[in-house]
């Protein structure tokens, strides 16, 4: 496990109406990501039709230290078993965002998928995100690869 800088923590603020949902947490000691759960009413689950997208709320806001981001990533089991994944994977939650964290999901499967209250819908991973100096130049350093892309180095 890599060292976390002293005094830094990820702080979650619970939104009203989700006292029954657990705070995001790591499922195992070695987990890189922590579970994000759906904050939808018990009587109004989200039914995600094949090919459809939705924005699923988590019921939490988050404070991330400057210089870091929270990446919102798919859950592999959801993708494998149901074809449900994060549309903009990885989604980015910036350190200065304080609104509710929502997850953009898409159903790539062939059957309806129902998202119920408390379902684990994605995982959050904290990653360094420094703001690098951005500099315009006339030319870039030459490389062996050059401008070749999209399969130019082999399949």
Swiss-Prot record:
<comment type="function">
    <text>This enzyme is involved in nucleotide metabolism: it produces dUMP, the immediate precursor of thymidine nucleotides and it decreases the intracellular concentration of dUTP so that uracil cannot be incorporated into DNA.</text>
</comment>
<feature type="binding site">
    <location>
        <position position="88"/>
    </location>
    <ligand>
        <name>substrate</name>
    </ligand>
</feature>
<dbReference type="GO" id="GO:0046081">
    <property type="term" value="P:dUTP catabolic process"/>
</dbReference>
<feature type="binding site">
    <location>
        <begin position="75"/>
        <end position="77"/>
    </location>
    <ligand>
        <name>substrate</name>
    </ligand>
</feature>
<dbReference type="InterPro" id="IPR033704">
    <property type="entry name" value="dUTPase_trimeric"/>
</dbReference>
<keyword id="KW-0479">Metal-binding</keyword>
<dbReference type="InterPro" id="IPR029054">
    <property type="entry name" value="dUTPase-like"/>
</dbReference>
<comment type="similarity">
    <text>Belongs to the dUTPase family.</text>
</comment>
<protein>
    <recommendedName>
        <fullName>Deoxyuridine 5'-triphosphate nucleotidohydrolase</fullName>
        <ecNumber>3.6.1.23</ecNumber>
    </recommendedName>
</protein>
<keyword id="KW-0460">Magnesium</keyword>
<keyword id="KW-0378">Hydrolase</keyword>
<comment type="pathway">
    <text>Pyrimidine metabolism; dUMP biosynthesis; dUMP from dCTP (dUTP route): step 2/2.</text>
</comment>
<dbReference type="InterPro" id="IPR008181">
    <property type="entry name" value="dUTPase"/>
</dbReference>
<dbReference type="GO" id="GO:0004170">
    <property type="term" value="F:dUTP diphosphatase activity"/>
</dbReference>
<dbReference type="Pfam" id="PF00692">
    <property type="entry name" value="dUTPase"/>
</dbReference>
<dbReference type="InterPro" id="IPR036157">
    <property type="entry name" value="dUTPase-like_sf"/>
</dbReference>
<feature type="binding site">
    <location>
        <begin position="92"/>
        <end position="94"/>
    </location>
    <ligand>
        <name>substrate</name>
    </ligand>
</feature>
<dbReference type="GO" id="GO:0006226">
    <property type="term" value="P:dUMP biosynthetic process"/>
</dbReference>
<keyword id="KW-0546">Nucleotide metabolism</keyword>
<dbReference type="GO" id="GO:0000287">
    <property type="term" value="F:magnesium ion binding"/>
</dbReference>
